[in-house]
C-alpha cells in the first residue's frame, strides 16, 4: 500500500478526464478537483515512476473560473467531474481537447463551427442506477463512487430531468415492494416524451401474484405516466409489467416519432440531440438528394431525418433489435425511402456483403461508439461519397479514423464540439469531410 503524503504544486493544465495537471521536479501529477492557475496542496493516492495521482486537500491560489458545485453529492458520486469549473470554461476545455487531438496529428480544418450547447442542468433523460438491499432490508440506490464499486446513495441529481430526479426520493421505498429473495442488479430510469420508464434488471421473474402491488403502486407515483419494465440478468430482454402498450417514444426533428425500449441506445441529452440533427442537416450539401448511408444507425436517430431529404437512405447497425426498431420507426413515420440492415461493423468486409448499397453515394454518416470505426474506414474512404459526416464521442479515435479519409483525398471542411454532457469531461464532436 502506498504511504499517503501531502505535496504542493501549481496546476498548469487539465487532463482529458478533467483532473488538474501539475509538475514537481519534472514529474507529472494528476490532481482530482484542481484547476489550471491554482496552487494546491494534494494528497498522493498513486505513485508511479513516471507520474503520480492525487486528490486536492486545500488551495493557496484559486482559479477565477472555479465555482461552487451545485450538487451535494459532487466529488463522491462518479457522475459529474467538472461542476467546480464555470460552464463556459467547460465548453472551452472540450473544444481545446478536440483541436489538440487533431493538431497532434497535424490534421487541420478549414472552419470551426460554433460549439453546440444548451441547458447545463436537468438535461439527462436517462440514468442507470446501482441498487442493493442492505442488511436491514432497505434499498440503497445511487451511483457508484468514483473509482469504486461502493454505491453513493443519491437523493438529488441536478443534471437529471426533473421528473426523474423526483423519483430518486421515492425509489428506495418503492423497491421495498419487491420480494426479498430477488436480487436487483440495476435500475434504469428513462424520460420519454410520453411517459417515464422504470426498468429493473433482476435475478428472477416476478410471479403473477407478485405483480399486483407493483402495478397498483405505479399509479400512486403520479404524473407523467410511469411504466415498469423488467428483465432477468444482463442478457435478458426488457418486458413491460404494467398494463398498456409496449411503447416509449421521443420526438425528433422533422415531426418524427422515435420509438424505443429501455436498454436500447438513445442520446441522453434531448436538447443537444435535436441541435445535433439540425447541425447535420445544415452541413449536408443543399444539392444532395440521392443516396445516404448511415453507419451505426441505431434505431434511426439520424437516418429518419435524412430520409426527409434523400431519395434513398440505408442504415446499418450491428444489433438485430435496433435494426428492427429502425425499420418499425420508418413504417410508423410513413417513410418508404429508408432501408435497414444488420452487419458487424467491427469486420472489415461487412459492408461489401450488403448488395443494396449503390456504388454511387452522396453522403456517408458515422456515429460510432468510443472505439471508433477503424474496421470500416477503408470502405468509407473508397465509397466515393461526396460528403462524410463523422459524429464522435472520442476525439482520439475520430482523428485516427479521419486519416483514412484524408489519405483518400478528403478534406475537413467543418469541425465542431457538442456539449452533450455538461459538468463531465465527456467530449462529443462533429466533422464534415468533402472531396
Which sequence ranges carry the predicted segments?
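Hydrophobic beta-strand signal
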Residues: 41-43, 128, 293
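Carbohydrate-binding surface patches
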Residues: 189-205
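Terminal RNA-binding accessory module
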Residues: 1-73, 340
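Short, acidic/hydrophobic/Gly-rich beta-strand patch recurrent on exposed beta strands
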Residues: 20-25, 142-145, 326
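Rossmann-like S-adenosyl-L-methionine
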Residues: 2-8, 13-16, 205-435
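Short, solvent-exposed loop/turn elements at beta->coil junctions and helix N-caps
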Residues: 113-120, 186-189, 233-237, 417-420
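Extended interfacial segments that mediate partner engagement and assembly in macromolecular machines
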Residues: 57-69, 75-184
Amino acid at each position: 500500500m502506498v504511504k499517503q503524503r501531502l505535496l504542493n504544486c501549481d496546476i498548469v493544465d487539465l487532463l482529458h478526464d478533467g483532473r488538474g495537471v501539475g509538475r514537481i521536479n519534472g514529474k507529472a501529477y494528476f490532481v482530482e478537483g484542481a484547476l489550471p492557475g491554482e496552487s494546491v496542496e494534494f494528497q498522493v493516492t498513486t505513485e508511479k515512476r513516471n507520474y503520480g495521482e492525487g486528490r486536492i486537500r486545500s488551495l493557496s491560489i484559486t482559479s477565477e473560473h472555479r465555482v461552487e458545485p451545485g450538487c451535494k453529492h459532487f466529488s463522491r458520486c462518479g457522475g459529474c467531474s467538472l461542476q467546480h469549473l464555470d460552464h463556459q470554461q467547460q465548453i472551452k476545455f472540450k473544444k481545446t481537447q478536440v483541436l489538440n487531438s487533431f493538431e497532434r496529428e497535424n490534421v487541420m480544418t478549414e472552419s470551426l463551427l460554433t460549439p453546440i450547447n444548451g441547458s447545463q442542468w436537468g438535461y439527462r433523460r436517462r440514468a442507470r442506477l446501482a441498487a442493493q438491499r442492505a442488511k436491514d432490508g432497505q434499498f440503497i440506490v445511487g451511483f457508484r463512487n468514483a473509482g469504486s464499486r461502493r454505491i453513493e446513495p443519491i437523493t438529488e441529481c441536478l443534471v437529471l430531468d426533473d421528473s426523474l430526479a423526483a423519483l430518486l426520493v421515492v425509489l428506495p421505498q418503492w423497491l421495498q415492494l419487491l420480494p426479498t429473495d430477488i436480487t436487483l442488479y440495476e435500475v434504469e430510469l428513462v424520460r420519454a416524451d410520453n411517459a417515464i420508464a422504470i426498468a429493473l434488471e433482476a435475478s428472477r421473474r416476478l410471479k403473477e401474484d407478485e405483480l399486483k402491488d407493483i402495478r397498483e403502486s405505479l399509479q400512486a407515483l403520479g404524473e407523467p405516466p410511469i411504466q415498469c419494465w423488467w428483465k432477468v440478468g444482463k442478457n435478458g430482454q426488457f418486458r413491460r409489467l404494467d398494463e398498456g402498450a409496449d411503447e416509449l417514444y421521443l420526438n425528433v426533428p422533422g415531426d418524427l416519432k422515435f420509438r424505443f425500449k429501455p436498454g436500447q441506445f438513445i442520446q441522453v441529452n434531448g436538447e443537444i440531440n435535436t441541435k445535433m440533427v439540425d447541425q447535420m442537416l445544415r452541413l449536408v450539401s443543399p444539392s444532395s438528394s440521392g443516396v445516404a448511408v448511415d453507419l451505426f444507425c441505431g434505431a434511426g436517430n439520424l437516418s429518419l431525418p435524412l430520409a426527409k431529404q434523400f431519395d434513398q437512405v440505408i442504415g446499418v447497425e450491428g444489433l438485430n433489435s435496433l435494426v428492427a426498431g429502425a425499420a418499425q420507426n420508418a413504417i410508423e413515420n410513413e417513410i418508404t425511402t429508408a432501408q435497414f440492415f444488420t452487419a458487424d461493423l467491427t469486420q472489415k468486409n461487412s459492408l461489401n456483403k450488403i448488395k443494396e448499397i449503390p456504388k454511387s453515394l452522396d453522403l456517408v454518416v458515422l456515429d460510432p461508439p468510443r472505439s471508433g470505426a477503424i474496421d470500416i474506414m477503408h470502405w468509407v474512404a473508397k465509397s466515393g461519397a461526396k460528403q462524410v459526416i463523422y459524429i464522435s464521442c472520442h476525439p482520439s479515435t475520430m482523428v485516427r479514423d479521419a486519416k483514412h479519409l484524408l489519405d483518400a483525398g478528403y478534406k475537413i471542411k467543418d469541425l465542431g464540439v457538442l456539449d452533450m454532457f455538461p459538468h463531465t469531461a465527456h467530449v462529443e464532436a462533429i466533422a464534415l469531410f468533402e472531396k
